[in-house]
Design a protein with these regions (language model features):
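Short, well-ordered alpha-helices that flank and scaffold nucleotide-derived cofactor binding pockets
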Residues: 24, 28-32, 56, 91, ...
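Glycine/serine-rich anion-binding loops at beta->alpha junctions
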Residues: 129-133, 178-187
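Rossmann-like NAD(P)(H) cofactor-binding subdomain of soluble oxidoreductases
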Residues: 42, 48-49, 58, 66-142
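Internal alpha-helical scaffold of NAD(P)-dependent oxidoreductase catalytic cores
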Residues: 113-123, 139-177, 188-228, 268-274
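A generic alpha-helix surface/boundary motif
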Residues: 25, 108, 190-194, 218, ...
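NAD(P)-dependent Rossmann-like dehydrogenase/reductase catalytic/cofactor-binding core
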Residues: 2, 214-278
Length: 278
């Protein structure tokens, strides 16, 4: 396996335009993974308090202006702003992005839209990460644009793979990944929240219930990842016929199944609307 000190990803300079939740999570994850030195990463955001906290934590360079961190012609530029303001950002920085590998994490903004805005010949890759990249347990989908090279794709896989797991796929599949995996942290947090409230209602103290459920969620995730056991098989293995888990699942599973399908459909519909508006 290639060590961080000799990998290509450890040598590249990276500009992250947007220091919100996801932009900060990527910067934090890349530095704490040991893959990228903090001196190779710059983050721009209009909110100085976000940037100061990030600089204090991991030591990356910061600036309130995107153009300032693009003056050094970074090897890779991550567009980490909301889809609704992406066009404004591109207008603001103009041709300063030219020559860099451009990575967009904006949901619903297609490669075709990005290519039209950035110009023919620009190397563009769409990546859909989720928030656990901040603790290097995230999941990211990678879809290359027309002029992105295989080396560009491999670089993105190495960078985002250091933040959890990363997979290359078509843009169509990336949209599905965004609707499922991209939204999944919120889904899982909702599950813990609702189970916590149910536990409180049944008599457990709030802090104790939340701690026990968070630990259980992490434990189940680790067991499934390590064993590669099918989730359905795992569920059946821990469910005794006629027991308490069986009774609980009888009530919960139909609601979760219907809700999950509707949630993914809603996320896909929203992504489609964003792409049309873009």
């Amino acid at each position: 396996m290639t060590s961080p000190s000799t990998s290509k990803a450890s040598q590249v300079t990276i500009a992250i335009l947007g220091g919100g939740s996801m932009g900060s999570a990527i910067a934090r994850g890349l530095v704490t993974s040991g893959l990228c030195p903090a001196s190779h990463i710059s983050v721009a955001d209009h909110n100085p308090s976000k940037l100061e906290a990030l600089r204090s934590e991991v030591g990356v360079a910061i600036s309130p202006k995107a153009k300032d961190i693009l003056e050094a012609s970074p090897d890779l530029c991550i567009l980490a702003v909301k889809p609704q303001v992406l066009n404004n950002l591109i207008d603001e920085v103009g041709d300063a992005l030219s020559g860099s590998l451009i990575v967009s994490i904006a949901a619903g903004v297609t490669l075709a839209t990005l290519q039209e805005a950035l110009g023919e010949g620009e190397r563009i890759v769409r990546v859909m990460p989720n928030l656990p990249v901040a603790v290097r347990q995230g999941a990211s989908a990678v879809a290359p644009g027309l002029w992105a090279t295989e080396n560009d794709v491999q670089l993105c896989l190495e960078l985002f793979g250091a933040l959890g797991s990363a997979a290359a796929m078509t843009e169509e599949r990336l949209e599905v990944e965004g609707a499922v995996v991209g939204c999944a942290p919120a889904f899982f947090a909702l599950l813990v929240d609702t189970l916590t409230r149910a536990a409180i209602d049944a008599g457990l103290p709030a802090a104790q219930a939340r701690d026990l459920l968070n630990t259980t969620m992490g434990g189940v995730s680790s067991m499934l990842s390590q064993s590669q056991e099918h989730p359905r098989a795992y569920m059946e293995r821990v469910t005794s016929p006629g027991g308490t888990t069986s009774a609980a699942l009888h009530e919960l599973e139909p609601l979760m199944a219907e809700g999950s399908f509707k949630a993914v459909e809603a996320a896909l519909a929203r992504a489609c609307k964003l792409s049309q508006n873009g």
